[in-house]
């Protein structure tokens, strides 16, 4: 009886985790380089005003989408979750300007997690009459980001970077997959402020 009870508890959780992991993987492979009013880069760690390698990969991808003419603006999202003197958004803008992106093509929003970032993007889009966005992050992060954007009624297309070091290290890839399953589940359950990524 105890064994059956344990199976009844564990099996649904396992099936849910497997389902979410499959969706994370599937959506992360989907690239929709669709014309939009702005490219949105979701921030992640920065160090003393310069992006971490994963953040740099996101920014490089956004730069390539801008260079292809898919959007006239790049919005860099990210706050200051650790009390640094730079926000993630400011570090991203600094990097993109260093790569030659003109200042007039750059906008920033704050927020210390994905949902807050996208809520700020929604407000800016309404303010600037931006009807659609092309969202950039890493593969593992795309499902949750796109679902959140759609829940906020943002017209969104997804274009993940494929150059993040987290994608090319099997141990890191597995870790971030597990982390994303937990974060997506927390969001679905109504906990809208999962750990920033």
Model-derived features with residue positions:
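A transmembrane-helix-recognition feature enriched in membrane-embedded lipid enzymes
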Residues: 21, 170-197
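N-terminal membrane-anchoring alpha-helices
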Residues: 1-37, 197
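A structural signal for short, hydrophobic/glycine-enriched beta-strand patches
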Residues: 20-177
């Amino acid at each position: 009886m105890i064994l059956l009870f344990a199976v009844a508890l564990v099996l649904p959780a396992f099936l849910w985790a497997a389902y979410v992991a499959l969706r994370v993987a599937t959506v992360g492979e989907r690239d929709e380089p669709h014309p939009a009013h702005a490219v949105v880069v979701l921030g992640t760690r920065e160090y003393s005003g310069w992006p971490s390698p994963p953040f740099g990969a996101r920014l490089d991808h956004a730069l390539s989408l801008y260079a292809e003419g898919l959007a006239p603006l790049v919005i860099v999202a990210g706050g200051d979750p650790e009390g640094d003197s730079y926000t993630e958004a400011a570090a991203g803008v600094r990097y993109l300007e260093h790569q030659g992106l003109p200042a007039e093509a750059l906008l920033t929003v704050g927020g210390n997690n994905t949902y807050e970032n996208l809520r700020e993007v929604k407000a800016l889009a309404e303010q600037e009459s931006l009807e659609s966005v092309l969202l950039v992050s890493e593969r593992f992060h795309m499902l949750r980001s796109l679902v959140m954007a759609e829940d906020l009624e943002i017209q969104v297309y997804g274009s993940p970077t494929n150059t993040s070091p987290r994608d090319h290290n099997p141990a890191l890839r597995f870790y971030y997959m597990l982390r994303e399953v937990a974060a997506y589940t927390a969001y679905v359950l109504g906990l809208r402020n999962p750990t920033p990524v």
